[in-house]
């Protein structure tokens, strides 16, 4: 489970049009691509993609998550933190959250995913509607210690199905950037 500072509200999540300091075009494409990240990572790794769970459980959500989900501050939710791995390397740190009340009534068993990809589940159910993609430089303090680094790009979006909303944040780790660059220059 990653740490959070109670006084820190969170990063400024921005839509594409709001970006002043945009990343290079290749990274911009990865950040704002509407397709399933799971499928893209699977292709990039030539089928050697895996999910490595780090934490799953109920806890108070961060202020920026509550705001994005329309919950009162310190609302409780299910938190799932995983690494999305390619070729045995941590490529993406993903944090998915959903409000307790919506999850219990929404028919999505996030607690039973194990090493399965949440993205695959969300993209295989046409009832889920993806909201706007937003990006930021993810706070170093919110990353697992082994991958804590300043200035890593992250994206997030909300998936809605009836009263159920799931907020998914994905942090692109340096090993992913290397893999993308290497694949582009083969």
From Swiss-Prot:
Coiled coil: none
One GO term of the biological process aspect: ubiquinone biosynthetic process
Any one cellular-component term (Gene Ontology): cytosol
GO MF, one annotated term: chorismate lyase activity
Catalytic activity: chorismate = 4-hydroxybenzoate + pyruvate
Broad enzyme group: lyase
Pathway participation: Cofactor biosynthesis; ubiquinone biosynthesis
Function: Removes the pyruvyl group from chorismate, with concomitant aromatization of the ring, to provide 4-hydroxybenzoate (4HB) for the ubiquinone pathway.
HAMAP family in alphabetical order: UbiC (MF_01632)
Similarity field: Belongs to the UbiC family.
Record's protein name: Probable chorismate pyruvate-lyase
Organism encoding this protein: Pseudomonas syringae pv. syringae (strain B728a)
Gene symbol of the encoding locus: ubiC
